[in-house]
Structure formats: structure tokens, C-alpha cells
Amino acid sequence: MNFSLTINSFFFLATLGLPLSLAAQRAPAASRATVSGTAVDGGAKAEPLPFATVLLRHAEAGDTSLVASGQTALDGTFALPQVLAGAYRLRVLAMGYQSLAQAVRVAPGQPSVALGLLKLRSASQQLGEVTVTGQKAVVQQELGKTVINVEKDLSSVGGTAVNVLENVPAVAVDATGTVSLRGSSNLTILIDGKPAGTSNGGPGPRLDQIPASQIAQVEVMTNPSAKYDASGAGVINIITKKDKKEGWNGQAALVVGNGAKYSPSLSLSRHVGKATWNLGYDGRDQLYRTRSNSQQTALLTDGATTSSLYTTQDGTGTQHNRNHSLNLGLNYDLTKEQSLSLSVQPHWEHQSELDNQTLTQQTVGSPTVTTQYGQQIADVKVTVLESSADYRHTWEAHKGRELTANAGMVKIDANIPVSQLLTGGTAPAGFKQQQQVNAQIYFGQVDYTLPSADGKGKLEVGLKNQVLRNTGRTAMLKPTSTDPSAEFQLDPTNSFAYNFTQVMPAAYATYQRTLAHGWSAQGGLRSEGTFINGGVASGTASVNRQYVSLFPSATVARELGKESGQSRLQFSYARRLNRPDFMQQLPIQLYQDPRNYRQGNAGLLPEFSHNLEVGHQLNLANGASITNTVFARFTQNAIQRIRTIDSVATRENNVGVVTRETYANVGTTNSFGLETTWAQPLAKWWRVSATGSVYYAQIAANALNTANRAALAGTARLANNFTPRKGLDVQLTGSIRSTVLTAQGRQLATGGLDLALRQRLFSERAALTLRVSDLLNTQVRRTEIATPELQTALYNKFETRVAWLGFTWYIGATKAKPDRIDAAPSSGGGFGG
């Protein structure tokens, strides 16, 4: 592909909106006003209400159409720009509160209308002698977006971003920390809009290194607009806390868990004049225990001869995580309309794993059983350095107009030595492997937003580029004999060095508009390119792939019901992409250990999907809310892992069954599902929220000659929040995930129950927390694999039942707010498998 032509096509797409932008800027705005205000709790403290919906309608006879709408910021403020002179009716809606209505009049020539504080009363309903009082929800559902207020969710407080995502509707986290959305682990994860999530294969910090105490909210977009990256089943944006109170503010915390688990943290900010300085530290020194068991029967072929080999493996071990993270940042207001932010975030990770194993091997029909005893040791050290700069320009005279720019880099250095020593039997006495990875990610993005002259529309355009450079080296060493004291020597056949560069430019344009009779619409188009080039240093294998794709998106919504904001129906569509990574395409044998190796597929194509959603949201006067979403995903060139038995290597290596794993496009798969969220106050001291999903998933088979399979699967979560007395918060949370199909078999059902308490102390200057994760110790990972040549049963148990005790001290103007707990880490390992 001609690279210069590709760049020109991106430039052409990015400038499609330029004539519209210039025309909009010429339109006069002097006769229009900005309507602004602040939504607050009607109580004595008048706390701000973030994420409240603000609607402005005509108040003239025969015309009650919607003029403008918006959402309050974290501090409760809102601004509706470009409002013509006239009479209007403003309505503010927040979950758990009675809606507020107020008349608004804009006089000709008036530049602004400041409404001041708009106090919303808690929704209440009399049930006999019990008063039901609404509270702000932990999970706030918006059609197309789910917002999770982490500060008020006790089940993940003090843990990490992984623990937070475990509680998000439609999101699942497995034992390795991999995040999946509606069954797909291919998704885009952002932190404050920047790349993140190395645990899911993306650039940026590991999600298990981001403390939950530093997260304000999480946004989940299952069908995002063209403004966002097209890669993955959706977008998860983790928004961190930002404090601009005058002077010193922050918090210090120490959390201790049974079995040698410690988590200290410190977060400080200082706002002086135009500058806000931020300093943060988070540490983890935690020891976990593990158990595992596997039983496997493999069918081996050697010409016309076949035989079956039965193997077992029992293991017990430990995992020791020691991590340190710093966060240094500066936000400076250059002018009233311009700001600049700088941040540097170094991370140090050290993970030690020790696993003692007992292995048996027996040819089916033979009385001879070979037993070996092994010890596998891994000592992983990773250093991550992030740095970024952000620029923001707004126009006070033209509310809603905004220019933002972001640039930064992420540098990753990893050293991963793994060794296995075996005693007994006739097999070689283990192996040693040394892996080194060095990666640099450079990214930059520019976005421009321009409201239309009548204030009912908005144009957004943007450019983005991301460059990934990666070099790595793997050295495999084998023993010279079966003697446990034998020397190890380099195995050049399974040792190699590689390097690659991947460039991903993108451009987008979207336009949204509020229409008459409660209708609104948004449409957009995104273009993304992928240019990847690299290979093995010896020149024996390489990858060279270039392609450009277009990704349209559209959303149509309408407000229903007699009251504004009471009911809303929305339809959305988006085309999305699963981009194969370098190692999935590199056609070399990469051994993880003597029994397993991966081999890339040079002919692997990108996977494309068409995603559709229909959603309905209903907000009731008593503070209850119900959201239902029906979704469908149609995938072309579905990428699937294919695992087979390497009979030749199994017979020659004398280490048991040797499996080969590769990737292939296996055709088309379809998935359909329903998600439901319900939240309601049952009493003044009790609020309940429930989320559930059920979906019909078609799974691509892991063998090319095997038909696809399909089955129903589902998840459910029920959270009960209690306030038995002032200053004491209690949360009891239960979750379950049904059996789900995998390419080779199925993953059995699992679930758990968590209990958390927090007592605020010293006039809300401090808090004491207690949390017990997996109270019944039921979280376990069990997997079954069934193919014509391989039958496997796997059992993995991570230490999930942990009691955590934490103390938090709030510094400066920061205080422990009701329903907010900031210390009580969750144990790692997802469902505990």
C-alpha cells in the first residue's frame, strides 16, 4: 500500500468538517445566552450532584419541544449555551431525587442567565410508618453508557481498577486479570481518555496497579461513537480523582490483610492560585496462596498407530506481589480559557511465583506410571514510566466550543526469568527461560468541538496517532541430562530475538443534533489505519501488514412519557475491529515451557463486527430506575485460538503431552443478549441495586473441521447498601456467573459473597474499614476441555477469602463523605481461579 496516499486520505477525512466549522463560526451569536447553574443536594450540606440530567424546553403554548440538554459535572455545575431569547422551562433530574422544574426567561441581548444553586429534594414514598428515601446510586445507567461511582461502592474500595471492573455490569474479569465485555476480551481501556491496560494487551499501566481509591468513576460504552477507537467490543474509560480545593488536601491510608498483605497509600494535592500540584504514592506487598489440579487424556498418532496418554498434575504455590507507584502532576490555568496539565507516573512491579508440582504420566492400558516432582519459579520485574501533557482551550463567548490536545509516551521494561526443576523419571530435569521485553508507546491526539449557531447541534472532529515500538529476546535453556544437578545449555532452536513497529493513525468526524418532539440523533465516521512491520532478528520469519478501514456509527434517541426524563428509548449502531497483534501473526514456535508452545499465523486477517443496541431507560418518582438493553453482534473473520496435540514433539521430547496453539479466522459468529439494571431505595436505611445479563453466544470451534457451538450464558449481581446508624455504612454483595462455552469446552459456573463495613470517625476526618472478600470461599476456576484428541479437567483456586482492616485519614478540606469508603483492598485473581 502507498503510505503517502494513505496519509493523504486521512488528511482529507479530517478536513471534511472544516467548511462546516468555518460556516458555523461566521453565524452571529450575540443574541444568544448561556443558561448556567449548579445542582446540589437539598440537605444542609448542599453537596453537588454530579451526572444529573438537565433539560431546557420551550414554555410557550403549543410548543414544549426540547431546546437544549446536558449533564452536570463532578462539581454539579452545568451550562447550556446558545439559547435564544424567550420563555423556557428547565428541569433537572438526578437518580434518587425528585425532579426540579423552574421557569427561565432569556431577554433579548442578555448574554447569560445564572440560576445559582438548584436544590433537589430526596425522592421519598410513604409505606405505612416507613419513609423510603432515595440515595445517589452507585451505578448510574445512561443509554449507551454506564457510569459507576467508585467512591460509593464498598465492594471494591481500596482495591485496584481490576476489582472495580469486576462490579461493572456486562464486564467480567478472569483469574489472570484479563477484562472482557459481553464475553469479548478485545476492548479499548482508557485512563482519563489515554491508552491503558497492558493486562489486556494494550499500552499503559497494568490495571491491577491502579488503586481504586484514586478512581472517581468508570464509564463503560458498549457501542461508542466514532470519536473513540474502533478496536474492541467497547470502551472502558477510568476517570481518576481531581481536587482543586484551596491549600493542602488528600488522604493517607494503610490497609492490612490476613496472611501478610499490606497496602499503604498517600494522595496529596495543593491548589494555589492558577496551579494545582498533585503527589501520590501507592504500594502493595501481598502474599497469596494457590492450589491447582489437572487431569488430561491425549490421543497420539504416529502414522497408522494411535495411543492414549493420561497425565495428572497437582500443585500448591505462592504468589508474592510487591509494587510501588508514584504520581506527579501539575495543572496550570494559563488564562480563564486555557489550561495545561503535565504528569509523570513511574511504576515498579515485582512478582515472584513459586509452584510445587507432582506430575504423573501413564500410557492408557499400561500398568507403568511415571511420577515426577517439580518446582517452577518465576521472578518477574517490570518498570513502567508514563508521561503526558494536556492542553485545553475553551471560549467564554462561545460556550461549548473547545479545543483539546494530548501527547505522551509510555516506556516499559520487563525481565521475566522462569525455571522448572524436575526430579524422578526419565524425562529431562526441567528447563530455564529468560525473556526480556522493551517497549515504547508514543501517542498524540487533537480534538475540536464546535456547537451550531442555534445551540441544538454539535460538530466534533479529531486526529490521533499511536506508534508502538517493541523489541524482545527469549532464551531457552535445557539440561544436559536427567540429573537434577546437570548444567543447562542454550537451546538455539527455541531461542530468538525480535523487533517490530506498529503505527495506527486515525481521524474522525461526528455530528449530533437535538430535533423536535423529543428526538435526537448522532452520526459519525472514523478512519483507522494499521501499519505493522517486524520480524525475527535472524530473518527466518517476518510480519508486514497494512490496511485502512472505515467505521461508521449512528445513534437515534427519543424521550417518552409525560414527564421529561422519565423514559427514554435509544437505538445505536457501530462497526468495530479486532486487530491481530504482532505475536499472533509471527510464524515461529514460542515455547512457554517444554509442554506448550504458540505459533503465529502470518495469514491472520483482522476481525470486523457489526454491533446493534436497542435500550430503554425508565426513572420513577420514588427514586427507582430500570434500564433494559437488547444487543446483537455479528462478527466476520472471527479470530479463534486453535489448540492441537503435537504428536511428534510429544514422543521425541519425553516431557508428556506437547500442545500447539495458533490462531485462525474461522468464519462468522453471532451473539445476542439482554442486560437489565434495577436500583431502588427500600427504606431510609436500605438501598438495593441489581444487574443481570443473559446472552446467546455462538462460539467459533477451535478446530477447522468442527462446527461452531452456541449456548446461553449469564451473570447476575445484587448489592445491598445499609446505613443502620449515622456514620456507619454496610454493604453486602453477591455475584454469580453461569457456565460459559469456550472454544474447546466450557468454564464452569462460579460466584461469591462480599461483606464490607465502614465507620466514619472524628467528625468525618477519618474512617475505619473492614472487608471480607469471598466470605464463603466459593470463588474457584474450573475448566473442561473436550476435543477429539484432548480431554482435560482443570481446577485452579486462588486465595480469595481475605479479611482486610484499613484506616484512612483525610487531609485538609477532604472529608469522608456518606456512602464513600476508600480503604479495603480486594484480593486478586478475578473469580479466584
Task: Cite the ranges covered by each PLM segment.
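Short, acidic, small-residue-rich periplasmic hinge/interaction motif at the N-terminus
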Residues: 40-45, 53-59, 93-95, 112-155, ...
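Outer-membrane beta-barrel translocator/receptor signature
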Residues: 215, 229-236, 244-295, 320-324
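Outer membrane beta-barrel strand-and-loop segments of large Gram-negative receptors
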Residues: 441-445, 489-496, 599-601, 605, ...
